[in-house]
């Protein structure tokens, strides 16, 4: 037996042996492994052979003392021993079966092999021979069967362990379950549950403030500086934070506990509309305002993007490389913009003050062109035909560049067919190239291009093939009314990304974008997203994307045909821009607009042609009339001269001179900068028509109205404090040192530098208040006072809406503001002063005041005056806007004679009256009321202005509701106690019972303002008949036509809609497509000559200024206070004083 087997001897004590046997009995029987079967069999056989001698030895040892026994007994004993051996072997077999189930290993030895190996049979034989000499010396105890079975069970356990090995995932899961414990709250941890961050009622509130759009960031920075500056002062501003969102323009948000803190923070900051108030943001809306929605940008090669920054902003580009997209860089290909202007011209352009960074046009890279301008060394040739110029790589004419991902826009790219075609190498839209390769860029139709009523179809998804009419549009879902199929007539919602516009062959469509914008034609072919149409002009095929088309309106009467336009025709490019045709070339028109810009447009881009040569008239720089056919020349600038062939709005004059090559001999100039080449007589001396203007002062004094010079005495402008309002020096303050023609030499205060500035770019600045006024007032206005001015009058009144304090000392006898002429009046009213000067000094002519801008001109050359006076433009007696000459208005615009100032009896029925429409059955209708004028023998009562004709021919006031009536009530005596400053002996006779003279200074404003047949208040106020074509989204009223020479009926649809109010947004030629406010289902196309503005009738209404000067026209304001027909508007940011506008110059806005 080997030494290893000896080490596996039975247990030392019987107790341990019994315990081992008990544990072995619990073990389950095992199936013998085939690989171990031979070894096990051999081991069992060896054990059987060894057991027999051991038993014999034991038997000899046990019976050593029984010598001499009989052999018969030995045989019996041997038989008994054999039986016992058989029984022992059976017991051992039973014990072996029970011990087949070995005990389980300890956990610490599960993955360790701690069993000793058993030597093979040959080694055992060698060891037996080696120990043969001492074989009898060693007392070999009988082997325990359990040790043998233990070895076999261990081997078997390793086999079962491999089969029953657990899965790795199961082990990991069990370890997680074992070690995972409940997370305990750590008071020192920085992690805060999200629900604890939500604002509550005890947290500071969030307030929103309305600001000027585009200045949100600047205003936030101003609030920061203001809060920090007052942080350690006695009254710090309790504002916690302020921010704005780019997605919410015109709004900033301030975090504070009280609204008073917000008001203190924004007070005095320009650009904040405090009239809108400070509004509290609800708690549930506070958290979403701070959420930043991050959008994942998915860029793929071939994708179309647009560049955001630099000179390529807005240019189309194509993604070519996304290898570095993880680093935030993407490679794009785009058409470069290289400035190929010669160096000499660039230097000249910079020297004369023109901007040097002009954006060059987009064109493909050309090596020869770049080399000529920048030199051979500036361009290097790279591999595979590429070029390197200015650190950029150019391949096939395109620039290949790596840019940051935020520098490109991936949404709403909407490339046009013309833009994409340039990437294919052909700019012609009719070229033969594969449209399917570029149509994928326009599959996703932007919902901004869809409107209710458009016909669309679904081209992908579960609803492919479904088509219908759009009913509602949202950012992601479009509701359509299905046509055809099982869902016919039902409203179905489809995803916006899966639809495209649908057009049928034969439909008349209009192009919305691209090179052929506004072109119209008939659809001849539809192929996927590409629609081919036959243009109405030129009969050429145009290919465009379906997204760039829309069904055209019925344009039967407006369809442009070839040959409709001729050279020098005036056309309208939009509602406010006019131009003349300088050349007709093929299907394009070369046009020079009113601003002097030349452009090529298609006839589809022209709204309408204006044929106004017969009625066009304007006034030149000397006050003389000019008309078509006159030869004029410029008074400044290039001193060009030419023949007038058209005039737009009496401001822009188009002239032609065949000697000029630019724009084919056509140029445009302003009327006030022209003078006649041939001498003309002075303007009509209207004093001969009205002898009352030549009356002498009492007691033989000189004439009250001497003829002044036509131009302003510009020497008075010297040493006047002015501010520059235009040009590169805008905002600088200086003093005029000299006046040379139309320019003034201004010495700037901040650096004593002298500049030459045009007078039109200067305004006078008050040293005390900082207010600015027109420059002409420096030579016109005098110090405060004069006849009628209150002495030592303050600048402002306590009552903001009334009083008689002059607004500014230089305004003369105004009570109290610029726009007056009324007694009593609001703060902005004024009463004429016969000896004081001022802007808009009064409605009645003042012989001693220049009255620049006044409604009724005085002795000076006042632009816009309507009552005749020396040098007055137009010299007209009627109310505002009468277009004909110095005539007293009457029916049919036929002038009548002003009654004889010296006549004591009414003139005859057909002469000497101021005719007016509508006698209303009065017996004095065809004549004049007896004059209250005194004969020449009584000079003390002689008036010094035109007598006011009596009778209903010129009632004072005229018919009720007329905005131009005189403020003296007709039929009642003028109160003698009226506190109107003036000189009684110079007062005009105000009509009324009795022959007394009211203390009204220098005549009442009594131009006849009654509604005449065929003319309306708009025409009298200066509003042209087509005023409505300059505005949109306004409310209008329908009335009789007031277009001169109109061939349309007097009433629109026989007066069915007279007095009704409409709102409109669409303009079609000279018509508007308007919706009846009382019944939105009624839509009418109404000519502009029937439209009148809807007047404001209450405060808080949003209106637009449709008349007045260019600085006011077009402004949108909110009415605040009304007095005497004029409205004061709410203050807005940047206002120096309240804006007051005559109610006749306002029109209500339709949709706010």
Curated annotation (Swiss-Prot):
The keyword Aminoacyl-tRNA synthetase does not apply. Residues 68-95 have a biased composition (Acidic residues). Residues 1-104, 906-966 are annotated as: Disordered. GO terms for molecular function: mRNA binding. One of its GO terms (biological process) is regulation of DNA-templated transcription elongation. Its main location: nucleus. InterPro entries: KOW (IPR005824), KOW_Spt5_1 (IPR041973), KOW_Spt5_2 (IPR041975), KOW_Spt5_3 (IPR041976), KOW_Spt5_4 (IPR041977), KOW_Spt5_5 (IPR041978), NGN-domain (IPR005100), NGN_dom_sf (IPR036735). Keywords: mRNA processing, Nucleus, Transcription. Pfam families: CTD, KOW1_SPT5, KOW2_Spt5, KOW4_SPT5, KOW5_SPT5, KOWx_SPT5, Spt5-NGN, Spt5_N. The keyword Iron-sulfur does not apply. CDD domains: KOW_Spt5_1, KOW_Spt5_2, KOW_Spt5_3, KOW_Spt5_4, KOW_Spt5_5, NGN_Euk. GO terms for cellular component: DSIF complex. Belongs to the SPT5 family. Component of the SPT4-SPT5 complex. Interacts with RNA polymerase II. The SPT4-SPT5 complex mediates both activation and inhibition of transcription elongation, and plays a role in pre-mRNA processing. This complex seems to be important for the stability of the RNA polymerase II elongation machinery on the chromatin template but not for the inherent ability of this machinery to translocate down the gene. This is Transcription elongation factor SPT5.
């Amino acid at each position: 037996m080997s030494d290893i087997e000896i080490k596996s001897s039975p247990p030392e004590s019987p107790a341990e042996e019994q315990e081992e046997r008990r544990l072995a009995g619990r073990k389950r029987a095992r199936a013998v492994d085939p690989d171990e079967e031979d070894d096990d069999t051999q081991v069992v056989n060896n054990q059987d052979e060894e057991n027999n001698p051991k038993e014999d030895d034991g038997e000899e040892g046990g019976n050593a003392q029984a010598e001499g026994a009989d052999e018969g007994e030995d045989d019996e004993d041997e038989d008994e021993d054999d039986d016992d051996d058989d029984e022992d072997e059976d017991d051992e077999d039973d014990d072996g079966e029970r011990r087949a189930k070995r005990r389980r290993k300890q956990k610490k030895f599960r993955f360790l092999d701690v069993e000793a190996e058993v030597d093979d049979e040959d080694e055992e034989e060698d060891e037996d021979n080696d120990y043969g000499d001492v074989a009898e010396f060693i007392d070999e105890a009988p082997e325990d069967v359990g040790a043998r079975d233990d070895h076999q069970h261990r081997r078997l356990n390793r086999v079962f362990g491999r089969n029953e090995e657990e899965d790795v995932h199961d082990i990991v899961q069990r370890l997680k379950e074992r070690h995972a414990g409940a997370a305990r709250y750590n008071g020192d941890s920085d992690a805060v549950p999200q629900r604890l961050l939500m604002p509550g009622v005890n947290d500071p509130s969030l307030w929103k403030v309305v600001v000027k759009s585009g200045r949100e960031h600047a205003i936030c920075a101003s609030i920061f500086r203001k809060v920090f500056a007052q942080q350690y002062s006695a009254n710090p501003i309790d504002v916690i934070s302020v921010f704005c969102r780019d997605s919410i323009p015109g709004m900033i948000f301030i975090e504070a506990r009280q609204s008073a803190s917000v008001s203190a923070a924004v007070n005095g900051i320009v650009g904040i509309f405090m009239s809108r108030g400070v509004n509290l943001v609800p708690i549930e809306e506070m958290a979403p305002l701070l959420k930043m929605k991050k959008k994942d940008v998915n860029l793929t090669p071939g994708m179309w993007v647009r560049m955001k920054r630099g000179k390529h902003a807005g240019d189309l580009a194509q993604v070519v490389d996304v290898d570095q997209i993880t680093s935030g860089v993407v490679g794009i290909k785009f058409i470069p913009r290289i400035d190929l202007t010669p160096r000499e011209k660039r230097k000249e352009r910079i020297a004369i003050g023109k901007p040097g960074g002009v954006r060059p046009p987009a064109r493909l890279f050309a090596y020869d062109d770049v080399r000529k301008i920048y030199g051979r060394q500036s361009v290097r040739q790279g591999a595979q035909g590429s070029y390197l110029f200015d650190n950029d790589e150019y391949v096939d004419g395109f620039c290949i560049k790596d840019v940051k991902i935020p520098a490109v826009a991936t949404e709403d790219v909407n490339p046009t067919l013309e833009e994409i075609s340039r990437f294919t190498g052909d700019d012609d839209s009719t070229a033969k190239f594969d449209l399917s390769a570029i149509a994928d860029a326009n599959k996703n139709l932007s919902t901004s291009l869809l409107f209710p009523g458009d016909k669309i179809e679904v081209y992908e998804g579960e609803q492919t093939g479904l088509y219908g009419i759009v009913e509602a549009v949202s950012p992601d879902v479009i509701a359509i009314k299905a046509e055809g199929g099982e869902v016919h007539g039902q409203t179905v919602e489809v995803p916006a990304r899966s639809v495209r516009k649908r057009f049928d062959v034969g439909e008349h469509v209009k192009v919305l974008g691209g090179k052929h914008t506004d072109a119209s034609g008939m659809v001849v072919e539809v192929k996927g997203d590409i629609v081919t149409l036959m243009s109405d002009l030129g009969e050429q095929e145009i290919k465009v994307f379906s997204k760039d088309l829309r069904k055209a309106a019925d344009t039967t009467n407006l369809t442009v045909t070839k040959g409709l336009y001729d050279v020098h025709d005036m056309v309208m490019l939009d509602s406010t821009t006019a131009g003349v045709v300088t050349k007709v070339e093929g299907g394009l028109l070369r046009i020079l607009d009113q601003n002097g810009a030349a452009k090529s447009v298609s006839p589809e881009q022209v709204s309408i042609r204006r044929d106004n040569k017969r009625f066009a008239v304007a006034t030149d720089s000397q006050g003389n009339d000019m008309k078509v056919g006159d030869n004029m020349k410029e008074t400044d600038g290039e001193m060009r001269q030419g023949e007038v062939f058209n005039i737009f709005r009496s401001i822009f004059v188009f002239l032609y001179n065949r000697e000029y090559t630019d724009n084919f001999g056509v140029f445009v100039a302003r009327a006030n900068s022209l003078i006649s080449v041939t001498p003309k007589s002075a303007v009509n001396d209207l004093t001969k028509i009205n002898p009352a203007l030549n009356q002498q002062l009492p007691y033989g004094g000189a004439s009250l109205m001497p003829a002044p010079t036509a131009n302003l005495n510009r020497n008075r402008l010297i040493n006047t404090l002015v501010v520059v309002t235009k040009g590169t020096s805008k905002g600088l303050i200086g003093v005029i040192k000299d006046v040379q023609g139309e320019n003034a030499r201004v010495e700037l205060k901040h650096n004593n530098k002298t500049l030459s500035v045009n007078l039109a770019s200067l305004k006078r600045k008050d040293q005390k208040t900082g207010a600015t006024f027109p420059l002409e007032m420096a030579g016109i206005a005098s110090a405060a006072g004069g006849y009628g001015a209150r002495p030592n009058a303050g600048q402002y009144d306590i009552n903001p809406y009334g009083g008689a304090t002059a607004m500014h000392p230089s305004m003369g006898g105004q009570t109290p503001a610029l726009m007056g002429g009324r007694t009593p009046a609001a703060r902005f009213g004024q009463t004429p002063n016969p000896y004081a000067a001022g802007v808009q000094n009064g409605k009645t002519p003042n012989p001693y005041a220049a009255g620049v801008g006044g409604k009724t001109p005085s002795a000076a050359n006042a632009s816009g005056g309507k009552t005749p006076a020396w040098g007055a433009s137009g010299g007209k007696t009627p109310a505002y806007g009468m277009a004909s000459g110095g005539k007293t208005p009457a029916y049919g615009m036929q002038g009548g004679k002003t009654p004889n100032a010296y006549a004591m009896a009414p003139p005859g029925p057909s002469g000497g009256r101021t005719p007016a429409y509508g006698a209303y059955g009065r017996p004095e209708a065809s004549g004049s009321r007896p004059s209250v004028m005194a004969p020449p023998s009584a000079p003390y009562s002689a008036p010094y202005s035109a007598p006011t004709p009596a009778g209903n021919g010129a009632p004072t006031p005229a018919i009720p509701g007329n905005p131009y009536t005189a403020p003296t009530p007709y039929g009642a005596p003028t109160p003698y106690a009226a506190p109107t400053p003036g000189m009684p002996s110079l007062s005009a006779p105000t009509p009324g019972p009795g022959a007394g003279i009211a203390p009204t200074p220098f005549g009442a404003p009594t131009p006849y303002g009654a509604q005449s047949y065929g003319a309306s208040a708009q025409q009298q106020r200066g509003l042209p008949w087509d005023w409505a074509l300059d505005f949109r989204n306004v409310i209008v009223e329908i009335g009789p036509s007031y277009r001169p020479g109109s061939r349309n009926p007097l009433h629109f649809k026989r007066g069915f809609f007279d007095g009704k109010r409409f709102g409109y947004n669409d303009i079609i030629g000279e018509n508007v497509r308007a919706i009846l406010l009382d019944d939105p289902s009624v839509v009418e196309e109404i000519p502009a000559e029937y439209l009148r503005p809807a007047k404001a009738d209450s405060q808080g209404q949003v209106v637009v200024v449709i008349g007045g000067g260019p600085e006011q026209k077009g402004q949108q304001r909110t009415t605040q206070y009304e007095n005497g027909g004029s409205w004061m508007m709410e203050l807005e940011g940047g206002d120096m004083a309240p804006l007051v506008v005559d109610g006749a110059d306002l029109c209500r806005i339709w949709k706010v």
